[in-house]
């Protein structure tokens, strides 16, 4: 049995001048045990102007949150620059390369996925999801964005709710943060 602690779903959207990020609360040990149902995987950074959410190993994600916040401070809140610098450090550092997590970071102007392979990806349609239920949340979010007048916050919540109904590694203890 794989005893790493992981699995989650994070969804982010920008719409009509608003930005929202949602994450579920489940932490799973391996593939059989729910360790925690109320984890907070979406955080406000840089005086509340940036949202960050993680999927993957909890301990690794805390390391990345800390490093990303340091980069935000270093580059005066420039999200893109901080994300690129984090990705370069993550990919280039032997110890950091071992970290098993992905991040979504966003402000009111941008959404980015940052990975340990050095990638920084900006979605074409102002919404993105990562984690075990990411594809389910992304599908729901795209449909809701195209065919409803829901707010960014409501789409984020509903997308996570759909993912929680399909993915066993995602629960419906959903936290939504909005900018």
From Swiss-Prot:
Record has Hydrolase as a keyword: yes
Activity regulation info: Allosterically activated by HslU binding.
Coiled coil: none
EC numbers on record: 3.4.25.2
Origin species: Staphylococcus carnosus (strain TM300)
A GO BP entry: proteolysis involved in protein catabolic process
EC class: hydrolase
Gene3D superfamilies documented for this protein: Glutamine Phosphoribosylpyrophosphate, subunit 1, domain 1 (3.60.20.10)
Protein name listed in UniProt: ATP-dependent protease subunit HslV
Protein role: Protease subunit of a proteasome-like degradation complex believed to be a general protein degrading machinery.
Residues that bind Na(+): 164, 167, 170
